[in-house]
């Protein structure tokens, strides 16, 4: 949806909730705000709608606890399909652990029922925020492409104001075409030859198989993990070295993308991302060695360690940098609290500088040990 004088009127929202009463109430409140609303009572049906109408929605508002496919699974599928859609979770469950799980899975916000109209009035901010991220990615890709064609080392800066909606869509389609091409090459590597049949069988990376892979990488260390040793530790019949090599490459690119998002964001966004990473470490979902490789810092397996990241501070014209320090321990299991709508709490993170703990309004954390990273290979057969 283009941002014009009428924005946010006409914002296209998909609402998913198995509670029909709550669903109709939300629809009425959103219609009063001049939003275009599509309602759905089942998460799997909502996923089908998103696949068939990829460019028909600007935002998804989903309940957490639903029969069949829950809100977390829907959130993961939206991320795997690379729809670039902000997803807001909502639930009557306001426990810190539940909220943190939603944020770690990639939710940009978490609303606690009953939801007030004031909270729905400003959800358009997440759409604007996501478009700004897309513009930054487009600016970076255009600069790299221009440098490659000209052979010059000069950095080409493209003004954000010059990035029109049409150019954004072209860049988006170009990225999807490249991804499909890479996926086809990877699928060819993942096929196993059957001597008795001319057809090839496909290796599907299920949640359990991916978890074995992650455990093997954590045991070896992300820097020392090679396909041959990972294959020996996994000991899965029918799995080849080429399959593991392809999956390891995707896993490293995923960690690199997390590191890149954290280094390119501003102070507030960086603080939120490192809070999410701290939550993953505290809950045991992210291995310390993997985290160390992500930021290029060594970590002792037998002692608590800390890593520091310099975050540029451009606010208020200050030229100094602020240092953000997070404690990491493989045996740590300290609770992490998050401020959300209607819920007061304090953040248990040790920070240096003037970084404030604001309410988490946007989450970029991902659970590397769970199904949030697993590629849905079956969707590419369509």
UniProtKB/Swiss-Prot annotation:
Predominantly expressed in young leaf tissue. Gene3D superfamilies: 3.40.50.2300, Homeodomain-like. Residues 12-128 form the Response regulatory domain. GO terms for cellular component: nucleus. Its main location: nucleus. GO terms for molecular function: DNA binding; DNA-binding transcription factor activity; identical protein binding; phosphorelay response regulator activity. Residues 171-193 are annotated as: Disordered. Two-component system major event consists of a His-to-Asp phosphorelay between a sensor histidine kinase (HK) and a response regulator (RR). In plants, the His-to-Asp phosphorelay involves an additional intermediate named Histidine-containing phosphotransfer protein (HPt). This multistep phosphorelay consists of a His-Asp-His-Asp sequential transfer of a phosphate group between first a His and an Asp of the HK protein, followed by the transfer to a conserved His of the HPt protein and finally the transfer to an Asp in the receiver domain of the RR protein. InterPro entries: ARR-like, CheY-like_superfamily, Homeodomain-like_sf, Myb_dom, Myb_dom_plants, Response_reg_B-typ_pln, SANT/Myb, Sig_transdc_resp-reg_receiver. It comes from the Eukaryota. GO terms for biological process: cytokinin-activated signaling pathway. Residues 202-252 bind DNA. It holds the Pfam family Response_reg. Keywords: Activator, Cytokinin signaling pathway, DNA-binding, Nucleus, Phosphoprotein, Transcription, Transcription regulation, Two-component regulatory system. The modification 4-aspartylphosphate is found at residue 63. It is found in: Nucleus. A motif (Nuclear localization signal) lies at residues 199-202. Residues 171-181 have a biased composition (Basic residues). Binds the target DNA as a monomer. Belongs to the ARR family. Type-B subfamily. Transcriptional activator that binds specifically to the DNA sequence 5'-[AG]GATT-3'. Functions as a response regulator involved in His-to-Asp phosphorelay signal transduction system. Phosphorylation of the Asp residue in the receiver domain activates the ability of the protein to promote the transcription of target genes. Could directly activate some type-A response regulators in response to cytokinins. This is Two-component response regulator ARR14. It comes from Arabidopsis thaliana. The lineage of its organism: Eukaryota, Viridiplantae, Streptophyta, Embryophyta, Tracheophyta.
């Amino acid at each position: 949806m283009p941002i014009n004088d009428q924005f946010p009127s006409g914002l296209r929202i998909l609402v998913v909730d198995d509670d029909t009463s709550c669903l109709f109430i939300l629809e009425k409140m959103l219609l009063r705000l001049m939003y275009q609303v599509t309602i759905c009572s089942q998460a799997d049906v909502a996923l089908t709608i998103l696949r068939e109408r990829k460019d028909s929605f600007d935002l998804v508002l989903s309940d957490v606890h639903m029969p069949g496919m829950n809100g977390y699974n829907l959130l993961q599928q939206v991320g795997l399909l690379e729809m670039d859609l902000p997803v807001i979770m909502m639930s009557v469950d306001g426990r810190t652990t539940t909220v943190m799980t939603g944020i770690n899975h990639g939710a940009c916000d978490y609303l606690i029922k009953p939801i007030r109209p004031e909270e729905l009035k400003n959800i358009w901010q997440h759409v604007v925020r996501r478009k700004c991220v897309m513009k930054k990615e487009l600016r970076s890709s255009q600069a790299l492409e221009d440098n490659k064609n000209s052979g010059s080392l000069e950095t080409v800066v493209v003004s954000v104001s010059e990035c029109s909606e049409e150019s954004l869509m072209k860049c988006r389609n170009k990225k999807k075409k490249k991804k499909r091409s890479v996926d086809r090459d990877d699928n060819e590597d993942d096929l196993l030859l059957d001597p008795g049949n001319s057809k090839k069988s496909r290796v599907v990376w299920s949640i359990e198989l991916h978890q074995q892979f992650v455990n093997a990488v954590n045991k070896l260390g992300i820097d020392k993990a090679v396909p041959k040793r990972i294959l020996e530790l996994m000991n899965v019949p029918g799995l080849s070295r080429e399959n593991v090599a392809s999956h390891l490459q995707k896993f490293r690119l995923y960690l690199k993308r997390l590191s890149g998002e954290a280094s390119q964001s501003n102070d507030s966004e960086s603080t939120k991302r490192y809070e999410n990473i701290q939550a993953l470490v505290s809950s045991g979902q992210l291995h310390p060695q993997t985290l160390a490789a992500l930021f290029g810092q060594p970590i002792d397996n037998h002692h608590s360690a800390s890593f520091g990241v310099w975050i540029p501070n451009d606010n208020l014209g200050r030229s100094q940098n602020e240092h953000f320090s997070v404690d990491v321990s493989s045996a740590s299991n300290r609770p992490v609290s998050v401020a959300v709508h209607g819920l007061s709490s304090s953040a248990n993170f040790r920070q240096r500088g003037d970084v404030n703990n604001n309410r988490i309004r946007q989450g970029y954390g991902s659970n590397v040990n769970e199904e949030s990273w697993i590629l849905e290979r079956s969707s590419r057969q369509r």
